[in-house]
Amino acid sequence: MNKKHLKTYKNVYSNPVKSDILWMDIEGLFRALGADISEGNGSRIRVKLNGERAVFHRPHPDKTTDKGAVKSVRRFLENARVKL
């Protein structure tokens, strides 16, 4: 994991919740953590990490992630027992 992934991880857990995290940075974090990512229908992606599964919707046309999605990513990482 590089500095960019660590920064994204910290941004996901920052309070108040950020709404300006680029989705591609979150996907990069998933990959750096060893997640399996597969394409779903439309702009959905399926993510599996440490036995935990989730489906996320890529934001469009904006590339930033809204607060609700950031909270979902946070819950997913917690359920997957990711700690840095």
Name what the model sees in each region.
Residues 1-84:
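Basic nucleic-acid-binding interfaces
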